[in-house]
Amino acid sequence: MAAGSGREEAAAAAGYGRGPPWVFRGRALYQLHLVKAATARAFVPRELRLVEAFGYTLGGMFLARYDDSPAGKFDELVVIAGIVWNPPTSCAWAARVLVNSAEACRHGRKEVGLPSHVATFSQTEADALRNKPLVKSNSFLSLLGMRSTVSNQGNDREIEISETKGSCTRHLCNISVPLTGSHKHKWMGPAIRMSLPSFSGQIEDHPDLLKYSCQVECRVRPVRPAKIWRPRITEPQECPDGKISSKGSEVLAEPDAQKHTVMVLLSKPILALEFNSLEMHVDAPKIVIPHSKKKEVRYSST
């Protein structure tokens, strides 16, 4: 087992060594949320300005399954706190990145300056949710004239995501993603190309402010927003240090960051896009100089 694990890590390292750009292929759900500015600020460095309107910023999540990547097959959840402004550009800021690949986690932290953590992604399929979701979809898409094209299948794929550290596990959330049927019998949406710029860094592994870009090619179509919830009752768990704690305790590091991450996920979804035939090229990050400290960007109706 140890030898096999070593070979896998060496192969993954060799895969990342062929970049940048690093190429990821698979499928994803890109979901935008209205996140309270007060929640997003918990993740944004003080020298960066949060772009907000009426007390909210634009955050959300990027939930992906990669069939081909420098680290092989793995799942990823990027929780986006909001949009930050560092002249002359604005970019997304990740609150937390969860992956079920140790090498992908290492690369995210060491090379890209992301707040990456190892997690488990447990999946089941169900006709109906057994738990009442705390986030409900809305009619925002109808305002864009997209309502008739949004998938409304009855079945969902439930994903339970738990952060792991050694042999200790802490449940983060459950995500119910709509199943949209076989690709052979559905409209995949138009083929598009776009760039998703992001800021990163300001962590122990990368104290500098970084900027990188993801060049995305995929087929995109609007879908029903995923439903996200967290069970109200958790069972106690014994961690390696012998302490008994619930899965919501402070045994793992950054309890406040995890709490605010869940708050971002439970915020109001306004748009969900399904990315199929995804090919994403991630450029190497570059160091940028933070602009002088100013108050958050604010907009008003006057």
Curated annotation (Swiss-Prot):
Signal peptide: none
Record-linked SUPFAM superfamilies: Acetoacetate decarboxylase-like
InterPro entries named among the record's database cross-references: ADC_dom_sf (IPR023375), NDX1-like (IPR039343)
Function: Required for neoxanthin biosynthesis. Probably not involved directly in the enzymatic conversion of violaxanthin to neoxanthin. Is necessary but not sufficient for neoxanthin synthesis.
Protein name: Protein NEOXANTHIN-DEFICIENT 1
